[in-house]
Amino acid sequence: MKQSLAVKTFEDLFAELGERARTRPAGSATVAALDGGVHGLGKKILEEAGEVWLAAEHESDDALAGEISQLLYWTQVLMIARGLSLDDVYRKL
């Protein structure tokens, strides 16, 4: 029997990142990124977007999914840095 993997939803990730921003655990990469500010986060998002594009062109679906997950992570960190909620974004979909 194949063991199922726990799946983290977009909402779960946002809640987890928000908790890290509030509690500021030592050694957290999320906290360090938030402390680096919006400019650094924007640069990271551009980097990840490029990696998504390259993965779409040249890599497997699994590799592409991994790159997309990183883009979503950094986008959510930027949202938290700017004080946006998921609902702020959902209203624009």
From Swiss-Prot:
EC number(s) on file: 3.6.1.31
Gene Ontology CC terms, in alphabetical order: cytoplasm
GO MF annotation list: ATP binding; phosphoribosyl-ATP diphosphatase activity
Nucleotide-binding listed as a keyword: yes
Catalytic activity: 1-(5-phospho-beta-D-ribosyl)-ATP + H2O = 1-(5-phospho-beta-D-ribosyl)-5'-AMP + diphosphate + H(+)
Cellular localisation: Cytoplasm
Main localization category: cytoplasm
EC class name: hydrolase
Keyword Nucleotide-binding: yes
Keywords: Amino-acid biosynthesis, ATP-binding, Cytoplasm, Histidine biosynthesis, Hydrolase, Nucleotide-binding
GO annotation, biological process: L-histidine biosynthetic process
Record InterPro entries: HisE, PRib-ATP_PPHydrolase-like
Pfam families: PRA-PH
Pathway(s) it belongs to: Amino-acid biosynthesis; L-histidine biosynthesis; L-histidine from 5-phospho-alpha-D-ribose 1-diphosphate: step 2/9
Family, as annotated: Belongs to the PRA-PH family.
Name the UniProt record assigns to this protein: Phosphoribosyl-ATP pyrophosphatase
Provenance organism: Mycobacterium avium (strain 104)
Taxonomic lineage: Bacteria, Bacillati, Actinomycetota, Actinomycetes, Mycobacteriales
